[in-house]
Amino acid sequence: MGRVRTKTVKKAARVIIEKYYTRLGNDFHTNKRVCEEIAIIPSKKLRNKIAGYVTHLMKRIQRGPVRGISIKLQEEERERRDNYVPEVSALDQEIIEVDPDTKEMLKLLDFGSLSNLQVTQPTVGMNFKTPRGAL
């Protein structure tokens, strides 16, 4: 079984990654040298633990965003995704089919004046079998 990492190791690794992300990689030995240069770490054992966790987090970051670590590149990508505007608006279609409930919601949101709305009756849900022994 693996060892439990202390909050000192985790916090130090997160701070190092946020500040020096561009200098770090997936190699433990280069991360160890970077940690040695940028931080005053009292012991060799602690330095190696921090460098190991930095390497672990760097591998996780490559797969996707990691909770608790804010990197400018990831922030910009998230901002770009949030501000996405489609080429053609969904409201520019010739006929938009909606059910009566959706029509009511659009009316409450002041979209009731859309001329291309066509109210259709909702389709009946799946025909589920009755549970065994219910008859």
Swiss-Prot record:
Domain of life of the source: Eukaryota
Localisation per UniProt entry: Cytoplasm; Nucleus, Nucleolus
PROSITE patterns the UniProt entry points to: RIBOSOMAL_S17E
Cysteine disulfide links: none
GO cellular component: cytosolic ribosome; nucleolus; small-subunit processome
Keyword set, alphabetical order: Cytoplasm, Nucleus, Ribonucleoprotein, Ribosomal protein
Family annotation (InterPro entries): Ribosomal_eS17, Ribosomal_eS17_CS, Ribosomal_eS17_sf
GO molecular function: structural constituent of ribosome
Primary location class: cytoplasm
GO biological process: ribosomal small subunit biogenesis; translation
Keyword Nucleus: yes
Family that this chain belongs to: Belongs to the eukaryotic ribosomal protein eS17 family.
Family matches, as PANTHER family: 40S RIBOSOMAL PROTEIN S17 (PTHR10732:SF0)
Protein task: Component of the small ribosomal subunit. The ribosome is a large ribonucleoprotein complex responsible for the synthesis of proteins in the cell. Part of the small subunit (SSU) processome, first precursor of the small eukaryotic ribosomal subunit. During the assembly of the SSU processome in the nucleolus, many ribosome biogenesis factors, an RNA chaperone and ribosomal proteins associate with the nascent pre-rRNA and work in concert to generate RNA folding, modifications, rearrangements and cleavage as well as targeted degradation of pre-ribosomal RNA by the RNA exosome.
Cited HAMAP family: Ribosomal_eS17 (MF_00511)
Subunit structure, as described in the record: Component of the small ribosomal subunit. Part of the small subunit (SSU) processome, composed of more than 70 proteins and the RNA chaperone small nucleolar RNA (snoRNA) U3.
NCBIfam families associated with the record: PRK01151.1 (NF002242)
Protein name: Small ribosomal subunit protein eS17
Natural source organism: Gallus gallus (Chicken)
